[in-house]
Amino acid sequence: MLLLWLRALCRRFQHVPCRVPSCQVSRVAKANRAGWEETSKSSVKWRQLEHKGPYFTPAYEPLPDGVHFLYDGKPLKLSLAAEEVATFYGKMLHLECTSKEVFRRNFFSDWRKEMTPEERRLITHLDKCDFTEIHKHFLERAEARRTLPREQKQKLKEEAEKLQQEFGYCVLDGHREKIGNFKTEPPGLFRGRGDHPKMGMLKRRVMPEDVVINCSRDSKIPEPPAGHQWKEVRSDNTVMWLAAWVEHIQNSFKYVILNPSSKPKGEMDWQKYEVARRLKGVVDKIRAQYQADWKSPEMKKRQLAVALYFIDKLALRTGNEKEEGETADTVGCCSLRVEHIRLHAPAGGQEHVVELDFLGKDSIRYKNHVTVEKLVFQNLQHFMEDKDPRDDLFDALTTSSLNKHLQDLMEGLTAKVFRTYNASVTLQEQLRVLTRAEDSVTCKVLAYNRANRAVAVLCNHQRAVPKTFEKSMQTLQKKIETKKAQVAEAQVELQKAETDLRMRGDSKPKSFLQKQRRLLKLEEQLARLCAKATDKEENKQVALGTAKLNYLDPRISIAWCKRFGVPVEKIYNKTQRERFAWAFNQAGEDFEF
């Protein structure tokens, strides 16, 4: 109802047509499609690569003498290593994670490893530790940074820019390209997402001895910091990373890579979406095949077909094979267990309802009630027969066998390609249904966010409700009430002016037209505030950015903006416009994914 009211109200005023900002046109990638296709076929990614290496986090600065760590109510001077880790915890006192038992246990265990023997003898209980002064110190320091004089802020900005110029660019095949993340991640406490079993563990400081440098043989090898050396220097032109190291908590690789707005990254983005577009030509055949395989006498073939159905219709990931206990108990399609699935009896006119409940990537809970095809439901019943809750649902299937099957169906096909294809198709179809040409830009942006939300729900891109949500909604509601009062007042003034005009029989004077314009302006402002409130409420538990950046072909959004007169700035911020600069030239208003 609110959207209908907004549409009716917004028809009274129209907005100027969309234009691609001139500053963005100049940044559009000049490489043509044929050139990209040629480079995509080669395993050689570059011939020259030169850079300065990563920028390392500065050494720890000890706490001032007036800031104390207290144990059992008494000040205790810590060694530098133990004090640094204590500050990590102190900075986070205001966060909910520090109240979680897993976080506290992991932190205390890792903290004790950094203590001296004497400190370990004295500090035996986290409950007796008082980090209040440390927490207060960092709050005050943050506030001091916020209130710095303009001259000092400008000086800090210039220092950051100098650092960016020195470490934030590389030379790739004769071209200066921006680097995305040239700084190593600072040490701290691991938080993870969801209820991660390793939350609270110490993220160690990355040292040059941990880092592998990748550059061309004929380039100048970056100098490590004084007194240090690189773990290794190699020249591998089949990869696009500049430096790499292993993050010890999850034993995963971290990379220094090019900025998303760089030409090579743009080419990779384009290739990703072109592979997903190729799926459009064979997806009907693939679906017909896995539906036929639901009836196969071979258990493995039936499990493969049902798994592929889940990947296609529910955007599930395949699920990486990992050793037990290595990471959180996160699962994907192949690693689903019987305990993650519930088959519901017919109820309320609904049949073949399946409930899935498990921890997905980044420990984000996936919980969904979905109506499936009858044969899928029956196959799931067979897969679950005579199994314990902890047994694999797809016991005849492995991640590697599923991935190989996907490659056999189409070169380059992965679960991510399916997710990209279905996400982009969903956005395109939802925009077609929700967008009306006569609507205002405000209503069109609201429609776009609703289409984006449909994709986020499909991909299970959730987030916790922001802690500031209620407060910000109350503030927004007050603004709406104030604006409604202003609209009502302006309506009364306009009606009074109309009455005066009729009594005098005059033509519309300047004052009347001013009141009329004021009312229209206030109504437009009210419409925008109401749309913003609706948008915030509907998206409070949905993360729209992940799909927009990683799974939605930007040409769909740019074409929609051009077709319906929506400024691209309403959909993509400056950084995102730079990242998708390659798409501006390729997306006419008639582009179809």
Curated annotation (Swiss-Prot):
It catalyses: ATP-independent breakage of single-stranded DNA, followed by passage and rejoining. GO terms for cellular component: chromosome; mitochondrial nucleoid; mitochondrion; nucleoplasm. The active site is at 551 (o-(3'-phospho-dna)-tyrosine intermediate). SMART domains: TOPEUc. GO terms for biological process: DNA topological change. It holds the Pfam family Topoisom_I. Residues 1-43 form a transit peptide. InterPro entries: DNA_brk_join_enz (IPR011010), DNA_topo_DNA_db_N_dom1 (IPR013034), DNA_topo_DNA_db_N_dom2 (IPR013030), TopoI (IPR001631), TopoI_C_dom (IPR025834), TopoI_cat_a-hlx-sub_euk (IPR014711), TopoI_cat_a/b-sub_euk (IPR014727), TopoI_cat_euk (IPR013500). It comes from the Eukaryota. PROSITE patterns: TOPO_IB_2. Residues 254-255, 317-322, 414-416 are annotated as: Interaction with DNA. The record marks 145, 193, 241, 272, 330, 361, 403, 461, 479 as: Interaction with DNA. GO terms for molecular function: DNA binding; DNA topoisomerase type I (single strand cut, ATP-independent) activity. Keywords: DNA-binding, Isomerase, Mitochondrion, Topoisomerase, Transit peptide. It is found in: Mitochondrion. Divalent metal ions (calcium or magnesium). Residues 261-593 form the Topo IB-type catalytic domain. Belongs to the type IB topoisomerase family. Releases the supercoiling and torsional tension of DNA introduced during duplication of mitochondrial DNA by transiently cleaving and rejoining one strand of the DNA duplex. Introduces a single-strand break via transesterification at a target site in duplex DNA. The scissile phosphodiester is attacked by the catalytic tyrosine of the enzyme, resulting in the formation of a DNA-(3'-phosphotyrosyl)-enzyme intermediate and the expulsion of a 5'-OH DNA strand. The free DNA strand then rotates around the intact phosphodiester bond on the opposing strand, thus removing DNA supercoils. This is DNA topoisomerase I, mitochondrial.
